[in-house]
């Protein structure tokens, strides 16, 4: 019976030009949710809207237009009411916020409304928690996702729990066609025997790929699924057919809960199955890779009877030679490039089949397996018995001239220069060439130290008249650091920095008590003792204390002067022998330096030289500005000040 239309809705439809059709009594209108479930086009539009990615569009505007089109194809506003569209959006958002594992299960049940989805989740929460396994089965190029609940130590309550896959075929297929299906590979009377094999397969914990919620277009492959299960029970299926494989993109889309579930339940169960199928895969390695959030992609090849597995073993103790350390520092080679001469070109996989890990602990032996075929591995052959010494552990760069071997290519290139005479490093100042850059750097320091320097205007820059020798102007090699302001050289950079403060006037050391600044830290330390009132140096004889050690030592010498240098004529004491000898010459009037012209005597030789200029008339100090000469240096300096005052 058709539902009566309200007058208000009827007027609205007539204004919008919508054609009204009267339904007959024998026609029943299906609900919109059921229509959506049965219509594969609507489901496809829904999936296209959910899986749309921004990268599929060329521009942001095109992405927005594409989303509007997909949303319109899914929601169909011309056929649904606002309440129905709102219910679909709420249901989609509810499924999105569910946890990953629970979301996949609820979507597989295809709830028609939000209330039905809530009922499914509440019913699942009331059931006891049991681990589930997800298996991806490849059947003629198609992937079939199946979920199986693992019953730990519990037998099925009835044989009906293991349903015959033949009975789950499409309803349109008759029993006769199912019996004579060529995909089964067995007549109908052999079905009980197949059921026994399938029951044995269930007890051995081999996951049975069942999924009642697969799309309708895949239902035609149920017969292929039965053939697959039959072959699996007979041991004709390899691990690749029942492997749980994830690509890099699929693994990055999983949340931490799904990755933990995959590592705890799927790998622990599936690896056990693989071992039972004679696949020697160590289970902890793959599980540790999964828990470190790295997808494990197995590489399994079909077993070949005529080909022996190429399996190599490499043992490394962790110790490295000196040549090996230099090679690792100078050559940026990956492990794959290093081992390619021995192992050949590896196949391209997401996870390489060969790998070497150098342990930090030299006491532990680290062994890794090499090869591509792991389906028939029963024993490993030592690499040292089948291949020569590894290149990393020996010398493999040979000189073609003399035959000498080197561990690194850079060492060989440097050695070849001895044969060719090549000197690629050239000095830009003098043109001299060197074979090594270190030799050139050492040579350039000589140019920097011997560079000519023009001294300021003082008694040192009087080259024409001053008796300053070239040896005094050229610093020794032991003082390579020169001051750019005055040309003075220093042996250490710290001395140069301390000296430069005399030119800049910098005083980086401040007294926190009075704020006074100093150029050297030692002076600041001495100054701070004034504020603290500390005089740590106390004289043991007279009780006088001193704040500086040098003054304390000078005071100590005064007490010991009687025993050192005491003048017997006047009683004066002297701490130094030179001062005492000069004092004695005064008493004896001894002047060993005598002038041959006038007979005048002098106690010092420099005084005699200066006196002799009065006889010879020599004036060695000449003014470079006016040419006037003087007999003494300080006379010239006093004269030059007159020139500087005139220019200013």
Curated annotation (Swiss-Prot):
There is a cross-link at residues 22, 454, 460, 507, 521 (Glycyl lysine isopeptide (Lys-Gly) (interchain with G-Cter in SUMO2)). Pfam families: KRAB (PF01352), SCAN (PF02023), zf-C2H2 (PF00096). Residues 165-182 have a biased composition (Polar residues). Residues 237-308 form the KRAB domain. It comes from Homo sapiens. InterPro entries: KRAB (IPR001909), KRAB_dom_sf (IPR036051), SCAN_dom (IPR003309), SCAN_sf (IPR038269), Znf_C2H2_sf (IPR036236), Znf_C2H2_type (IPR013087). Residues 46-127 form the SCAN box domain. This is Zinc finger protein 202. It is found in: Nucleus. The keyword Ubl conjugation applies. The gene is ZNF202.
């Amino acid at each position: 019976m058709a539902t009566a239309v309200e007058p208000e809705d009827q007027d609205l439809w007539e204004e919008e030009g919508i054609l009204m059709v009267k339904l007959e009594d024998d026609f029943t209108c299906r609900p919109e949710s059921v229509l959506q479930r049965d219509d594969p086009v609507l489901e496809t539009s829904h999936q296209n809207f959910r899986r749309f990615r921004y990268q599929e569009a060329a521009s942001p505007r095109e992405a927005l237009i594409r989303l509007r089109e997909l949303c319109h194809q899914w929601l169909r506003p011309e056929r649904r009411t606002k309440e129905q569209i709102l219910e679909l959006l709420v249901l989609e958002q509810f499924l999105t916020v569910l946890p990953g594992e629970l979301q996949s299960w609820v979507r597989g049940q295809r709830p028609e409304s939000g209330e039905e989805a809530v009922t499914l989740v509440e019913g699942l929460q009331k059931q006891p928690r049991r681990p589930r396994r997800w298996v991806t089965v490849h059947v003629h190029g198609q992937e079939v996702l199946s979920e199986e609940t693992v019953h730990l130590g519990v037998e099925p309550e009835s044989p009906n729990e293991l349903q015959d896959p033949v009975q789950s075929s499409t309803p349109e297929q008759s029993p006769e066609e199912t019996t004579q299906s060529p995909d089964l590979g067995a007549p109908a009377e052999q079905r009980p025997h197949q059921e026994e094999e399938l029951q044995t397969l269930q007890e051995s914990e081999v996951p049975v790929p069942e999924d009642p919620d697969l799309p309708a277009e895949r239902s035609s492959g149920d017969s292929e699924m039965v053939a697959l299960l039959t072959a699996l029970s007979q041991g004709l299926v390899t691990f690749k057919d029942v492997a749980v494989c994830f690509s890099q993109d699929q693994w990055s889309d999983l949340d931490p809960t799904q990755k933990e579930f995959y590592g705890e339940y799927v790998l622990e169960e599936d690896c056990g199955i693989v071992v039972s199928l004679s696949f020697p895969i160590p289970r902890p390695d793959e599980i540790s890779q999964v828990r470190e959030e790295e997808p494990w992609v197995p590489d399994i090849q079909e077993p070949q009877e005529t080909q022996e597995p190429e399996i190599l073993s490499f043992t490394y103790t962790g110790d490295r030679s000196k040549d090996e350390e230099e090679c690792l520092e100078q050559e940026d080679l990956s492990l794959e490039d290093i081992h390619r001469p021995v192992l050949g070109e590896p196949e391209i996989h997401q996870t390489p089949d060969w790998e070497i890990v150098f342990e930090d602990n030299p006491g532990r032996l680290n062994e890794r397996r090499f090869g591509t075929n792991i389906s028939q591995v029963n024993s490993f052959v030592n690499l040292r018995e089948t291949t020569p010494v590894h290149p990393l552990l020996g010398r493999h760069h040979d000189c073609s001239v003399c035959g000498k071997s080197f561990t690194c290519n850079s060492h060989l290139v440097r050695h070849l220069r001895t044969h060719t005479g090549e000197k690629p490093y050239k000095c830009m100042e003098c043109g001299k060439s060197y074979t090594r850059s270190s030799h050139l750097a050492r040579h350039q320091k000589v140019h920097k130290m011997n560079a000519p320097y023009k001294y300021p205007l003082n008694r040192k820059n009087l080259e024409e008249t001053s008796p300053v020798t070239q040896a005094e102007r050229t610093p020794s090699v032991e003082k390579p650091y020169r001051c750019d302001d005055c040309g003075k050289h220093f042996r250490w950079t710290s001395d140069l920095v301390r000296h430069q403060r005399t030119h800049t006037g910098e005083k980086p050391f401040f007294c926190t008590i009075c704020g006074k600044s100093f150029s050297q830290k030692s002076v600041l330390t001495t100054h701070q003792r004034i504020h603290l009132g500390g005089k740590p140096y106390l004289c043991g004889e007279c009780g006088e204390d001193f704040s500086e050690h040098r003054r304390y030592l000078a005071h100590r010498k005064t007490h010991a002067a009687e025993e050192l240098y005491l003048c017997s004529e006047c009683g004066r004491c002297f701490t130094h022998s030179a001062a005492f000898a000069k004092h004695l010459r005064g008493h004896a009037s001894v002047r060993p330096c005598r002038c041959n012209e006038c007979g005048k005597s002098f106690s010092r030789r420099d005084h005699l030289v200066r006196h002799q200029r009065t006889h010879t008339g020599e004036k060695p100090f000449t003014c470079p500005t006016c040419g006037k000469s003087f007999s003494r240096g300080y006379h010239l300096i006093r004269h030059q000040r007159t020139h500087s005052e005139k220019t200013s």
